[in-house]
Amino acid sequence: MRISALLWVPLLACSPDTQDEPPALPQEAPAVRPIHFVEVAASVGLAWRHDNGMSPQRHFPETMGGGGAFFDYDGDGDPDVYAVNGGPIVADPASEVPVNALFHNDDGHFTKVNAGLSHPGIGMGVAAADYDLDGDLDLYLTNFGPNTLLRNDSGTFADIGAAAGVDDGNWGTSCAFADYDLDGDLDLYVANYVAYDPQAAGAERIPYIANYESHRGQAPPSYPHPDSFSGQSDLLYRNDNGEGFVDVSAAARIEAGGKGLGVAFADYDRDGWPDIYVANDAVRNSLYRNNQDGTFRETAALAGVGYGLDGQMEAGMGVDWGDYDADGLLDLTVTNFQAEPNALYNRDGTFFSPATFDAGVGLPSLPLLAFGTQFFDPDLDGDLDLFAANGHVLDNVGLIDQSTSYGQRNLLLRNDGGRFTDVSAAAGPGFDLQRVSRGSAVGDYDTDGDPDLLVFNSGQPLSLLRNDSGHGNHWITVRLAGADGNPNGIGARVTAYSGDLVQTRELRGSRSYLSQSQLHVSLGLGHRSQLDGIEVRWPSGRIERFGPFAAGQVLVLIEGRGISAQPSP
């Protein structure tokens, strides 16, 4: 793979409204080829199995984890893998404690390393960012129990959660970094779930299967329903110049309560300030619109993204933003429980409109229970396709509902002009698997230009789905280096022009469910062999344009400086 060292060409002015768009060039499109994924985890060194700590007591956290990350911890250009482990909720002191695992990527093969990341605990989620501006990616981990911040010092990590003020002891789930106040450093949002006490034996709990009875007249054992517990409040931490964090949740008007599972930042209203969406379980979802003064206004119901199609609260799990209909506006997807379709909300200006069934997402997702989700472009045709990681929360669900199963196939929906088609059955052996999937992440682990999938399965081996589509489509990958405290350009908006194709992407790593994707922007060009131009709106507000570029390379765009030459990974 080549990393571009071409001259950069910043175009005039700073407003996209004042620029002439590159002319559309007529091209003949080739026939559509299948998307093809192959499971390769064990063969490339990722033979790792998640421990969910499943017990006869069926403690609630056993069924909700876990996640992980594609992130480049050593700065060599290859995305490494971090897997978050679970373990027994009530541990036997004589038993070995499960730990998280870090795998170093060396040209597409992984080796397990320690580096100070073998963290014990009932792990849930992870987010990666260079919060202290020392040039390498740090990790924040959520747990059922105290969370922690792992500071990266040239490839070796140290636990500084307590010292940094972010060791909250609630049940943390998804988390994400972004510069919400635009002060030049990356802040942190942590979703919290419910107040579950494993020692509260005999407490009245609402089971998921309360309305079902076995042939013997009794309901089989069940994990509790989230309605059994009160929600815990999410947390917003302001970064204090890389020295630590301050809890500003109340001052920023983050609502108390909630049952947060998925979180993703995005500037959905295009005002230059990051907003926050939280997928909540069995209560209204939250959309926090940034007031540009350090506070937020909760607007989910008003904007049309707080409830399901029938106005009912749903079991929100994972979340992602993406411009699936190529109108320049970020749309929203949220995964839900079985018999609740995964939601697709189309941004149509001021509000969102439900597009779940009109766009083809509803019916394929109805029989499945989904957690992780990604907008991504595996066939590199320029349209954002949609992935969902599926698996039931009840290990014995087949006893009371023979239409479903604990392990489920994952879902791949192919986008053709804003309409999705279920292509899972034809997407290769990687989609033949039936697993209990939870978190998911996207990254190009083998550096061949197309996105691969990393899926974390509860109590099972993780899955690495290599993209072997062989479609022959062209691509460009964009890595960003922001100034003023945001070295990876998290939150930057990229608009790419290639003939008649215009793509809008926003760089963020933490999304989906409990997981972190590779910090780059993957652009599929289809049959087009050139990218005519790229516009980057940096979190600082600066707007720059670059190009043109030949396809098939990685561009490293540095705010205010242009393109940097780097060695090939």
PLM region descriptions:
Residues 4-13:
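Bacterial N-terminal signal peptides
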Residues 33-36, 44, 54, 360-366, ...:
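Gly/Ser/Thr/Pro-enriched helix-cap/hinge segments flanking short amphipathic alpha-helices
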Residues 65-75, 123-133, 137, 151, ...:
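Beta-propeller blade termini
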